[in-house]
C-alpha cells in the first residue's frame, strides 16, 4: 500500500490570526498514516503532515504549533543510525510537553515519548497482532480521554517492542501480554501502544504490511495468523473505530483548551 503525501503547510508562523488550532503529524512510514485520528483532527484543526525520514525537517521550535501527533512505524525507537530524525523529534516532544501543548503518540510514537523522557524501549519477547483485548485501569476512570468508556476494548495491535513508563506517568490501559498499553504524562501528553488510528482498509492490510514479523514469530503458521487477524477486523473494527473517534475528539478538546488559555494569557 502506498500513501500519497499531503502538501505540507508551514507551522512556523504565530497562530494569533488563525481560528483553528494547528497540529503537526509526524509520519514515519507510508503504510501507517493518521487514519481515523487524522480524520477527526482535520475536522477541527489545521493539520500538517511531515515525513522526517524522507528528509523533511522537523521544526526546531513549537511556534505556531498547538498539538503534536506521532504515528507508528516498523523502526525501533532507539535506531538513530537508520532514523536520524529521532534526534530532532525527542526535544520537540519535550518542548511540547513542557509548554502544555498536547502530544498524542501511537505505537512507535508512544515509545518515542518514553524515550524522550529517559526510558528504554526494547523487544518484549513476542508480537501482538490483531484486535486484541486491552483493559482500562482504575486511573482511567478519572482521565479526560478515557473516563466512562467500557473497561475492555478490542483494538488493533502490531508491535514487537515495549517500553518503561516515564517517571510520573499514569498507566491508563494494560493487558496480560504487554503491560504498558496506554499512559498519560502530566495533563496533556498521551502514549498508546496499540494502533487505534487504523481504518478498516489499513487494518486489513496490516498482516501483509508486517509479513516479515509474522513469519519471524509464527513461521509456517503465518498464513493462519493472517486469517485470524482478518476475521478480527470484521468482528471488532467498529468497536475500535468508536474508541478512536471518542479518544481523539477528547484529546482535541485539550488542544483547544490549552490554546485558548495561551491566548488569554497573551492578551
Language model segments and positions:
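C-terminal helical/coil "lid" or tail adjacent to the Rossmann-like core of SAM-dependent
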Residues: 188, 193, 197-233
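Glycine-rich, phosphate-binding/catalytic loops in enzymes
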Residues: 40-43, 84-88, 121-122, 174, ...
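Pocket-forming structural segment of enzyme catalytic cores
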Residues: 117-203
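N-terminal beta1-alpha1 cap of cysteine-dependent amidohydrolase-like domains
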Residues: 1-101, 220-267
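Tryptophan-centric aromatic hotspots in well-structured domains and transmembrane helices
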Residues: 40-41, 131-133, 158, 206, ...
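Hydrophobic/aromatic beta-strand patches that form the interior of the parallel beta-sheet core
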Residues: 24, 50, 69, 104, ...
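Cysteine-nucleophile active-site neighborhood
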Residues: 70-140
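Short loop/helix-cap segments at secondary-structure boundaries that form the rim of catalytic
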Residues: 38, 58-63, 113-114, 164-166, ...
Amino acid at each position: 500500500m502506498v500513501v500519497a503525501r499531503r502538501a505540507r503547510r508551514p507551522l512556523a508562523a504565530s497562530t494569533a490570526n488563525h481560528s483553528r488550532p494547528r497540529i503537526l503529524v509526524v509520519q514515519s512510514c507510508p503504510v501507517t498514516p493518521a487514519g481515523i485520528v487524522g480524520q477527526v483532527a482535520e475536522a477541527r484543526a489545521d493539520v500538517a503532515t511531515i515525513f522526517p525520514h524522507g528528509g523533511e525537517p522537523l521544526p526546531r521550535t513549537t511556534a505556531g504549533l498547538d498539538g503534536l501527533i506521532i504515528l507508528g512505524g516498523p523502526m525501533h525507537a532507539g535506531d538513530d543510525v537508520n532514523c536520524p530524525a529521532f534526534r530532532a523529534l525527542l526535544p520537540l516532544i519535550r518542548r511540547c510537553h513542557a509548554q502544555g501543548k498536547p502530544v498524542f503518540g501511537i505505537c512507535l510514537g508512544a515509545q518515542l515519548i518514553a524515550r524522550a523522557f529517559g526510558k528504554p524501549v526494547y523487544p518484549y519477547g513476542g508480537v501482538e497482532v490483531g484486535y486484541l483485548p486491552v483493559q482500562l485501569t482504575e486511573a482511567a476512570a478519572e482521565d479526560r480521554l478515557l473516563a466512562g468508556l467500557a473497561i475492555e476494548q478490542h483494538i488493533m495491535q502490531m508491535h514487537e517492542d515495549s517500553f518503561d513508563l516515564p517517571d510520573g506517568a499514569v498507566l491508563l490501559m494494560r493487558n496480560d501480554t504487554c503491560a504498558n498499553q496506554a499512559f498519560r504524562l502530566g495533563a496533556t501528553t498521551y502514549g498508546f501502544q496499540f494502533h487505534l488510528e487504523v481504518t478498516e482498509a489499513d487494518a486489513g492490510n496490516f498482516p501483509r504490511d508486517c509479513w516479515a514479523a509474522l513469519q519471524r514469530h509464527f513461521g509456517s503458521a503465518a498464513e493462519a495468523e493472517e486469517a485470524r487477524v482478518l476475521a478480527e477486523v470484521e468482528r471488532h473494527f467498529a468497536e475500535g473505530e468508536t474508541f478512536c473517534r471518542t479518544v481523539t475528539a477528547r484529546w482535541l478538546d485539550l488542544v483547544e483548551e490549552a490554546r485558548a488559555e495561551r491566548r488569554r494569557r497573551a492578551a
